[in-house]
UniProtKB/Swiss-Prot annotation:
Subcellular location: Mitochondrion
PANTHER family: LARGE RIBOSOMAL SUBUNIT PROTEIN UL23M (PTHR12059:SF5), RIBOSOMAL PROTEIN L23-RELATED (PTHR12059)
Function according to Swiss-Prot or TrEMBL: Component of the mitochondrial ribosome (mitoribosome), a dedicated translation machinery responsible for the synthesis of mitochondrial genome-encoded proteins, including at least some of the essential transmembrane subunits of the mitochondrial respiratory chain. The mitoribosomes are attached to the mitochondrial inner membrane and translation products are cotranslationally integrated into the membrane.
Membership in a protein family: Belongs to the universal ribosomal protein uL23 family.
Principal location listed in the UniProt entry: mitochondrion
Cross-referenced InterPro entries: Nucleotide-bd_a/b_plait_sf, Ribosomal_uL23-like, Ribosomal_uL23/eL15/eS24_sf
Name the UniProt record assigns to this protein: Large ribosomal subunit protein uL23m
UniProt GO MF annotations: structural constituent of ribosome
Keyword terms: Mitochondrion, Ribonucleoprotein, Ribosomal protein, Transit peptide
Organism: Saccharomyces cerevisiae (strain ATCC 204508 / S288c)
Extent of the transit peptide: 1-45
GO cellular component annotations of the record: mitochondrial inner membrane; mitochondrial large ribosomal subunit; mitochondrion
GO biological process entries: mitochondrial translation
Database matches in Pfam families: Ribosomal_L23
Length: 263
């Protein structure tokens, strides 16, 4: 098939535009010139500029509304119409990460919660003003109970970070020597021991444990005396024959007692 030159492609382009019209009247669509492109882009710029002005006006309106509500000691947002007297939502306050400032707080919220719900909840229950809220939805992690079962996904976790008016600094954690209940060494070792015992299958059955510094086992196998293979087989056969003879003798004794009881 011969290759199309630039002039041939320009000649075929209006024909392709005509076929693309469909079942309507075949009407040739002219190719746009460079001037029309520049003109349309200038219109888009003008339109985006007007939209930006509208956004600025809305943001200024929200800012003034929020400022007036804070100065008057009222809500800095529009309160919802549905009244909830006994909220069942569980809100968990988390410790801040290294990227968080003292003016930020992070919560775990239900997946049905949105930003407006958290803002309303914190203000009416704790009197805390949430100025800006960001949402983060963590994917469910894969987990399994043990190696025999199939893996499954844990539920997703939804977190929200708010910005506050005043800073809040978490108190320092007490040292284990100050508060024995704050020492998590024993629970962590118990969890590690449980995981090791559940996963000790096959070649890992005799693997030494690491929980509690290996005191509770499983222990490493000690050196065993060398026994030749043929001698080990001979000893095992004698042991099995002796066990079979004892089992046969027990059955004969039981049968003899049963016959004596009948007479």
């Amino acid at each position: 098939m011969p290759r199309l030159t630039v002039g041939t492609k320009n000649m075929l382009y209006p024909l392709q535009k005509t076929l693309a019209v469909g079942s309507c009247k075949p009407e040739q669509v002219p190719i746009r010139s460079l001037a029309s492109v520049v003109e349309s882009s200038s219109k888009i710029l003008d339109k985006s500029g007007s939209d930006r002005e509208v956004d600025i006006n809305v943001s200024e309106k929200i800012y003034k509304w929020t400022k007036a509500g804070i100065e008057q000691g009222k809500e800095h947002f529009k309160v919802g119409g549905n009244k909830v007297y006994f909220p069942k939502a569980r809100i968990i306050l988390l410790r801040p990460n290294a990227k968080h400032t003292p003016y930020q707080a992070k919560f775990i919220v239900p997946k049905s919660f949105n930003k407006l719900d958290l803002r309303d909840y914190l203000y009416h229950i704790y009197g805390l003003r949430a100025m800006n809220i960001t949402t983060q939805l963590l994917h469910g992690k894969f987990n399994r109970m043990n190696l025999q079962t199939t893996r499954f996904r844990e539920p997703q976790i939804k977190k929200m970070t708010i910005e506050m008016e005043e800073p809040f600094i978490w108190p320092e954690e007490p040292r284990p020597d100050e508060n024995s209940f704050w020492d998590s060494t024993t629970p962590d070792n118990m969890e590690k021991y449980r995981e090791e015992r559940l996963n000790c299958l096959g070649s890992d059955a005799n693997k030494p444990g690491t929980a509690f510094d290996g005191v509770v086992g499983p222990y490493e196998r000690v050196a065993q005396p060398f026994i030749p293979r043929f001698l080990k087989r001979e000893i095992d056969n004698k042991r099995e024959r002796h066990a079979a003879e004892l089992q046969r003798a027990d059955k004969l004794i039981a049968l003899n007692r049963y016959i004596e009881d009948l007479h």
